[in-house]
């Protein structure tokens, strides 16, 4: 029987500080729990939403129960006995970091057990010899930034100077990343991409996981805004991914929606679809669920939870986006085929109530739905790789090097 897998990854949707959170300075972080608490206490009310966090479809798949198992606390406003239709687990990250690439790679069978390179200095973050080499190879006359920053704030602070000089803005964060900001029209999108490609080649030996192009538009700080033409340049995964096994062993289709292809350096991806907003990501995902052939894996990263609300520490915005996603999840469930396996998960936390603006080291929810899957708690996963191993089992692929299968279908012992 031909099968399909649909993975919906809510970027940054952690469910509580993991057992090693202290090592990352993240004790007390709980993305879901703290959003739910704020909503329950009417501290996340806005023109768009109010009251307790309402996620009935995620709850039916086991979200609240997964959080309860992870933290011993049910998120405020959630049901202790929901109408459960899914099987659920929670997962601890094995990888040595709390970034997007580490989380995504691990769940597809390539945990990051080495240390990425980082730029730890808050100011003058990048080594002079690196900056000099970038200038020499790209012929840019100068640069701005060279610091740790919030991506939206640095555009406000330096965007006008960038328009005067056309010097690109360089910045980083606690992640293994080198980000380049430039005006999409005045500097040029192709010029920005070319600059990022050169920078990536220079930085790859330092094990910098990603160089990210961050284009923006607008005439002054009041109307500057990022565009949908972000592009990530990532190091290639160091181990064979589930995607590659699926293509080699079953001639499967691997469909990337959003930034998935960039995260995996386009390894094992057969089709790519971009989308600019949360609504567009939902629309494209539903279109593929309706139209993709059997023997396909559809994988969407819903980046806006992280980029628009987690990093910006916007509790109300995060809650509103979750409620919008939950309403669209109803459509997903209605359009699944007879033998589709649906998985909802995350890659790390980014608690909008927590100090700073960085990711948070948290457990992630792992929620499964299939018509023949018994609703039940599947336990704690010691690695996100259990997700990939479970998919390999479902699709009849050879096992991955990491992870264990979590799935037990009706009729199986």
Swiss-Prot record:
It is an enzyme of class 5 (isomerase). Mn(2+) 1 binds at residues 11, 347-348. SUPFAM superfamilies: Alkaline phosphatase-like, DeoB insert domain-like. Coiled coil: none annotated. It catalyses: 2-deoxy-alpha-D-ribose 1-phosphate = 2-deoxy-D-ribose 5-phosphate; alpha-D-ribose 1-phosphate = D-ribose 5-phosphate. One of its GO terms (biological process) is metabolic compound salvage. Pathway: Carbohydrate degradation; 2-deoxy-D-ribose 1-phosphate degradation; D-glyceraldehyde 3-phosphate and acetaldehyde from 2-deoxy-alpha-D-ribose 1-phosphate: step 1/2. The keyword Cytoplasm applies. Its cofactor is Mn(2+). GO terms for cellular component: cytosol. It holds the Pfam family Metalloenzyme. Mn(2+) 2 binds at residues 306, 311, 359. Its EC number is 5.4.2.7. It comes from the Bacteria. Keywords: Cytoplasm, Isomerase, Manganese, Metal-binding. It is found in: Cytoplasm. The keyword Cytoplasm applies. GO terms for molecular function: magnesium ion binding; manganese ion binding; phosphopentomutase activity. Belongs to the phosphopentomutase family. NCBIfam families: deoB (TIGR01696), PRK05362.1 (NF003766). Isomerase that catalyzes the conversion of deoxy-ribose 1-phosphate (dRib-1-P) and ribose 1-phosphate (Rib-1-P) to deoxy-ribose 5-phosphate (dRib-5-P) and ribose 5-phosphate (Rib-5-P), respectively. This is Phosphopentomutase. The gene is deoB.
